């Protein structure tokens, strides 16, 4: 069975009386080399457990199952569960759970796997759900080694941007707090069925085992990042004054300058280390007023 062959994909879909569901962002890869490259880049440790989000008909699942000790897949579409039983039946190290990843208790689902060894994530994510799923994985506190995702190239550019670049935004800074993102390769739109309107990029995020950043108040740091980018056309002092009513614009400007920045700097110029220092200073200023 070749799950990258468009004819076999259509035969399988017809066999199970299924249609491609655009609302779920279902696009199936038809390039076997790309599939194998994604699987190879997912994790360095072949003894790992892989959490696959959105396996579809198993296009990537088989390659993961052939490379890693165990694959646990989460599939939201109930209609694809019997399809996966058919396409992945020969792989005893593969299992699928019919559940929405946004509602799933990943800690409970993968408890034995985390206790046994390393766990990484692999997913082909549609645009509309990329950020929510990524944030759930990052904020879960679970010790994933890597998160490898295939996403729209435009989104990948934002995830991998460096401070000072136009693509750099709140999600970039937040991601940099948890790990390091690297774009592995681009996948042209014509490698999918149905073909999306844009190219995709495979991004691997290596999560820190011990984070190098230590804000005094993590929630305040995230609040600072959010405020800095909600009005990105404005200077950082103006953006922060809209997000921190506890302090005056003058106080915030003084804090920005005290942290070593120009008074007219914009948020996109600050690295995650800068945001940690800035949020710590803001926190101290707020506390001093109480």
Role assignments for model-derived ranges:
Residues 1-227, 254-257, 268, 277, ...:
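Catalytic cores of RNA-modifying enzymes
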Residues 230:
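Active-site-proximal catalytic alpha-helix in oxidoreductases
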Residues 241-246:
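Short helix-coil junctions and helix-kink-helix linkers
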Residues 249-252:
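Short amphipathic alpha-helix in the helical subdomain of ABC transporter nucleotide-binding domains
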Residues 259, 263:
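Mobile late-domain/C-terminal helix-loop "cap" segments
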């Amino acid at each position: 069975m070749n799950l990258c062959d468009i004819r076999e994909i259509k035969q399988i879909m017809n066999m199970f009386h299924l249609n491609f569901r655009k609302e779920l962002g279902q696009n199936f890869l038809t390039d076997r080399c790309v599939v194998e490259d994604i699987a190879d880049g997912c994790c360095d440790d072949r003894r790992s457990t892989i959490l696959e989000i959105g396996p579809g008909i198993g296009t990537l699942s088989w390659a993961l199952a052939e490379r890693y000790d165990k694959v646990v897949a989460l599939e939201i579409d109930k209609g694809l569960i019997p399809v996966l039983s058919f396409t992945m039946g020969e792989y005893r190290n593969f299992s699928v759970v019919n559940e929405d990843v946004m509602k799933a208790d990943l800690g409970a689902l993968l408890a034995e796997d985390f206790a046994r060894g390393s766990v990484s994530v692999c997913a082909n994510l549609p645009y509309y759900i990329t950020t929510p799923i990524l944030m759930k994985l990052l904020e879960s506190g679970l010790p994933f080694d890597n998160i490898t995702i295939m996403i729209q190239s435009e989104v990948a550019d934002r995830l991998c941007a460096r401070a000072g670049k136009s693509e750099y935004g709140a999600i970039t800074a937040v991601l940099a707090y948890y790990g390091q993102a690297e774009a592995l390769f681009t996948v042209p739109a014509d490698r999918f069925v149905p073909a999306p309107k844009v190219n995709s990029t495979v991004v691997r995020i290596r999560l820190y085992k011990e984070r190098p950043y230590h804000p005094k108040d993590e929630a305040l740091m995230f609040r600072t990042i959010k405020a800095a980018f909600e009005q990105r056309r404005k200077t950082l002092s103006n953006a922060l004054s809209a997000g921190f009513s506890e302090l005056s614009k003058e106080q915030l400007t003084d804090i920005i300058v005290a942290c070593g920045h120009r008074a007219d700097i914009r948020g996109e110029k600050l690295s995650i280390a800068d945001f940690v220092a800035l949020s710590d200073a803001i926190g101290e200023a707020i506390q001093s007023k109480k």
